[in-house]
């Protein structure tokens, strides 16, 4: 504050940090204060007072009264406001994108297909239109709208750039959605695509553009006609297949963004979805990007090594899972040296799924103990499904063969 008061008006105009809060026309300063007592008397002296909670206030002070106000015993602390910036204003530079978009390299995505497999897109958003108002979206496949699926697929409806342009030329939103009825209800896909490829036409001087503002776009809205159903991995596989096939057809390099995911599987890359993604990533020139980190601290997964008694006793170790802390210690002390694996189930959860994956060659047996202490007995590792009742809890069990490429076997 002292530095701003000492600076000239020319210096303040050149440095936003110095000019923040100063009005050169009214010669007033806006300041933030913490105070004690009553500040009502300041209104009579030409100071506008806006009282906040917990003895904070915003003052609009004539420049001639600044020294007087700062010396008041009622003012515990005074602070000059600071300019705010959009938090994403520097996202491109801190992601090291700006250097590759300088005049020498000019890598803005021209000639590249960028596919967004998500919740859809607001195709009328200016960031996804060229300067002449036509769409940058080559294909839009909405899997939730039955009727006109792409060739080779059996769900949803696909819309071409020509159809989207006809919709954009409509005079009303009602006419537009009658031609191309796809909507991004949640807005997630639109936001993701804006980060990846928005051209900034909706912001002044294209300041808020995405990473590849000149890329050609392919959009797939995952889902079902029933909005209550969640998208499935089978639909995700078809979406990726659709995008890769189109890129091969038009002979363009392709980048696919996937922001969907789940917590199933052994996380060893052996599921059919994972092996398929690995396989198609080698076709043509394509890069598949997935979201990560949203559940990094939720403890959804656990891995560990169980000590084997085979060398000392020749016995196969028994592993028991329990949600009862009291039962845990009792099980751990049994004669066959069982290991307790505790898992938590919230009181509000009426159902949930738990998968246990083991190395294929290892032999284990499992006993479940309910919160009430009811034991299932040793569950035999017999392939197939079984049903079990532990008090009020119904269990549906499955012991499965490992997939052809897997190194682990699962018990669900």
Stretches with model-predicted labels:
Residues 57, 339-341:
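Short strand-edge motifs at loop-to-beta-strand transitions and within beta-strands
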Residues 65, 124, 188, 236-239, ...:
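Stable alpha-helical elements in mature extracytoplasmic
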């Amino acid at each position: 504050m002292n530095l701003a008061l000492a600076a000239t008006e020319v210096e303040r105009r050149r440095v936003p940090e110095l000019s923040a809060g100063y009005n050169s026309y009214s010669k007033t300063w806006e300041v933030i204060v913490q105070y004690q007592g009553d500040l009502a008397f300041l209104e009579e002296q030409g100071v506008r007072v806006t009282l906040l909670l917990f003895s904070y206030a915003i003052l609009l002070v004539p420049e001639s009264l600044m020294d007087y106000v700062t010396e008041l015993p009622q003012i515990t602390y005074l602070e000059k406001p600071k300019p705010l910036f959009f938090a994403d204003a520097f996202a491109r530079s801190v992601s090291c994108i700006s250097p590759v978009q300088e005049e020498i390299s000019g890598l803005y995505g021209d000639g590249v297909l960028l596919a967004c497999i998500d919740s859809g897109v607001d195709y009328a958003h200016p960031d996804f239109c060229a300067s002449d108002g036509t769409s940058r979206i080559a294909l839009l496949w909405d899997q939730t709208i039955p009727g006109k699926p792409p060739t080779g697929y059996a769900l949803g409806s696909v819309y071409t750039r020509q159809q989207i342009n006809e919709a954009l030329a409509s005079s009303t939103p009602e006419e537009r959605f009658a031609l191309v009825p796809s909507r991004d209800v949640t807005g997630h896909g639109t936001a993701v695509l804006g980060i990846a490829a928005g051209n900034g036409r909706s912001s002044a001087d294209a300041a808020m553009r995405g990473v590849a503002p000149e890329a050609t776009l392919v959009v797939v809205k995952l889902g079902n006609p029933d909005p209550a159903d969640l998208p499935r991995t089978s639909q995700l596989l078809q979406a990726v297949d659709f995008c890769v096939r189109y890129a091969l057809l038009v002979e363009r390099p392709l980048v696919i963004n996937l922001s969907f995911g789940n917590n199933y599987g052994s996380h060893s890359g052996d599921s059919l979805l994972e092996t398929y993604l690995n396989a198609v990533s080698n076709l043509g020139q394509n890069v598949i990007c997935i979201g990560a980190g949203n559940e990094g601290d939720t403890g959804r997964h656990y891995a560990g090594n169980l000590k084997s008694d085979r060398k000392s006793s020749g016995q196969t170790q028994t592993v028991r899972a329990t949600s009862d802390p009291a039962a845990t210690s009792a099980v751990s002390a049994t004669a066959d040296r069982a290991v307790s694996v505790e898992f938590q189930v919230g009181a509000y959860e009426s159902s949930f799924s738990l998968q246990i994956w083991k190395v294929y060659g290892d032999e284990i047996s499992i006993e479940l103990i309910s919160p009430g202490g009811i034991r299932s007995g040793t569950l035999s590792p017999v392939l197939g499904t079984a049903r079990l009742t532990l008090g009020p809890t119904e269990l549906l069990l499955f012991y499965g063969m490992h997939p052809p490429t897997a190194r682990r076997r699962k018990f669900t």
